[in-house]
Structures are given as C-alpha cells and as structure tokens.
Regions:
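Macromolecular interaction modules
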Residues: 1-105
C-alpha cells in the first residue's frame, strides 16, 4: 500500500473556516470518487495553536500501488479533482510517503 500526501496552503482570499468547509464538502466528494482509492483522510492545522504554520492542512490518499495512484489521477474523477484545486488552494506540494508504523494502536 502507498500513501500520497498533499501539503496545502489555502487561497489567500478564503478564511480558514471557508477553506475547511470547501475541502470537506465539494473537494472531498470529488476525491472520494477516484477509482482504486482505499482510504482518504483530510487533516487541518489548528490555527489557534499554530498560527504561523506554512500549511493549512494536508491530505492522505491510500492506494494499493503506484500504478493504481497514477490510474486514479488520470481517470475522469481524478482529473475533476485536480481541476478543482485552484478553487481553494494557492500552493499544493504532493509526495508519496513510505509509512513505517512504530506504535500500532
């Protein structure tokens, strides 16, 4: 299993609350429609505790393989999800993560 993480900085004209609302409704529905997606998690930075963090949040998308990830992004659902990014994101840095569990709970 592989995990793609996207580190996100919201558009400057959106409040944090508006960013969270859009991210968890419209954009999440687009992402969830991608074929082969095994797990999808969105995370938001607590701005009260970390007001100077460079990111507003990050996403985690799990796939069985790199080929499944690439197929999902190339699909019509993946293309719709990517096309939606400028509606709420200024900067998106995406990477594939190798996860090593130290403590399983």
């Amino acid at each position: 299993m592989i995990k793609r993480c996207g580190f996100i900085t919201r558009r400057g004209d959106l409040s944090h609350d508006a960013f969270v609302a859009y991210r968890t409704s419209r954009h999440a529905a687009l992402g969830a429609a991608m074929p082969g997606l095994r797990r999808y998690v969105v995370n938001f930075i607590d701005r009260r505790r970390f007001p100077d963090c460079a990111y507003d949040g990050f996403s985690e998308l799990w796939f069985d393989s790199e080929a499944d990830l690439q197929a999902a992004l190339a699909s019509s659902a993946g293309q719709a999800m990517l096309a939606d990014v400028p509606n709420f994101i200024d900067v998106l840095t995406a990477t594939v993560i190798e996860e090593r569990v130290i403590v399983a709970g």
